[in-house]
Amino acid sequence: MSKKVALMVVHQKRSSTGDVGLKLRERGSQLDIRRPVFCEKLPDRMDNHDLAVIYGGPPSANDNTDYIKYEIDWISNVLRDDKPFLGICLGAQMLAKNLGGTIKRSNDHSIEVGFYTLKPEGKGHKI
């Protein structure tokens, strides 16, 4: 069996894949790090990747920049190819927009909610 490849999308020149990247490496995955903000292209198909992670960063999914729109649209490729996807902060906003959701400030004007523990619910559950 070949080594798994995780596509990691980050938004700053010196961004790290952090604990997620570390855990994926510990489990034998190779990381393919891309930065669309610096005009790095994302694959049209996920044939050579086993999963995708889009990280956070300074922008909002509501920003009207070409690379933000490109990433939001690109998520459809991951979903179409039925690959696991993890959106962290901005990445979660992008997934919500891709699926037709709305991104807005909270009523208390807080910027983020902080850490939240995710628990696997099993394979094959569709959104």
Regions found by a protein language model. Give the residues of each.
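N-terminal beta1-alpha1 cap of cysteine-dependent amidohydrolase-like domains
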Residues: M1-D66, Y70-K83
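Helical cap/lid subdomains and adjacent loops of hydrolase enzymes that gate the active-site channel
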Residues: S15, L22, V113, H125-K126
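Cysteine-nucleophile active-site neighborhood
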Residues: I54-H125
